[in-house]
Amino acid sequence: EIILVGEMRDKETVDIGLKAALTGHLVFSTLHTNDAPSSITRLQNMGTPDYLISAACTLVLAQRLARKTCSECREPDPDVTPKVLEDFGFTPEQASRAKILRGKGCPRCKDTGYKGRMGVYEVLNITKPIKEAILAKATTPELREIAIKEGFRTMSDMGRDMILGGDLNFREFDRILSMD
């Protein structure tokens, strides 16, 4: 059985959703946070007991919607230097080899440089170490650190891959991820 809860805005809604998950229901809902690990902290700040979060949550997905660089008018972006890329988390090797693209504008994209949209997301699997960290009242940075050791990739990681693939331009990456 699947339950969809529009948005978890208060403790009562959270408790109902998580208790339904404990009874074997697959519960989908939304919660406004900047990233996946801070969803756990938000639930704690709403007064949800740690044992309930740890037992009921199996996965948290955080996402942003980005404009896709137009494939018809892509061209190298001369304004994005390796130094700028390194400042945004690219390795020196990635930054020196990267051919960063932008859309210059064409009839297909109505001179915007963008055509279509795509998701930039991160998926936090609630593994045993994450459950233990929740019960130990770990902070958001601590949860993120544990998750990264478990293979977690942030939205920034995914965004950097999309930039290197040419689908996301640097300005759009900065726009959607500077919201944090």
Where are the predicted features?
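Short, flexible helix-loop junctions that flank or precede catalytic/ligand sites
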Residues: E1-D180
